[in-house]
């Protein structure tokens, strides 16, 4: 199962960073071309479900996920259950100096079988760039976050 991990340091305390990270409806303010919303529950407990729509205009991808671990303010794990994005995702927040480090890991079950595995080396750098760029935007946003 291919994985993808990116991280960023944030000049804000763990509790503030966590609150910003799991403010699902506002993720579009920092995540590239994405809107997120809870669909079952509030998105703050194991078993709650979320939908993320990533795209531009009428072209996009729907990512459905279920929260499988909720350990505030340090860790949220989800299971992606959509048609394209499948597998575990992990958001972790750790104290670092006077601030925090956010680590985002995706353990992907690639679609299209062998074709997906063959295409991963081409897709991976683009996916990594998008996640890293989103996390860089998140860091600046989270430092100003007030809920």
Regions found by a protein language model. Give the residues of each.
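Conserved short-loop catalytic and cofactor-binding motifs
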Residues: 5, 37-38, 55, 119-122, ...
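Hydrophobic ligand-binding cavity/cleft-lining segments
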Residues: 1-45, 137-140, 147
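Beta-strand/loop substructures that line and gate deep hydrophobic ligand-binding cavities in soluble
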Residues: 79-133
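Glycine-rich portal/gate segments that line the openings of hydrophobic small-molecule binding cavities
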Residues: 28, 38-85, 96-101, 133-147
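Short hydrophobic/aromatic-rich motifs at helix boundaries and adjacent loops
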Residues: 8, 36, 61-63, 107-111
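Residue-level detector of alpha-helix boundaries and kinks
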Residues: 2, 12, 52, 78, ...
């Amino acid at each position: 199962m291919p994985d993808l991990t990116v991280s960023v340091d944030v000049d804000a305390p763990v509790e503030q960073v966590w609150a910003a990270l799991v403010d699902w409806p506002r993720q579009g303010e920092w995540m590239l071309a994405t809107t997120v919303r809870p669909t079952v529950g509030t998105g703050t407990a194991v078993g709650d479900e979320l939908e993320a729509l990533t795209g531009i205009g009428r072209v996009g991808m729907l990512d459905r996920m279920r929260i499988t671990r909720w350990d505030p303010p340090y860790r949220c794990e989800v299971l992606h259950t959509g048609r394209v994005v499948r597998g575990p995702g992990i958001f972790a927040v750790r104290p670092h100096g006077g601030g925090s480090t956010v680590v985002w890991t995706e353990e992907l079950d690639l679609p299209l079988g062998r074709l997906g595995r063959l295409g991963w080396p081409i897709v991976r750098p683009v996916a990594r760039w998008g996640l890293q760029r989103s996390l860089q935007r998140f860091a600046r946003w989270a430092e100003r976050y007030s809920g």
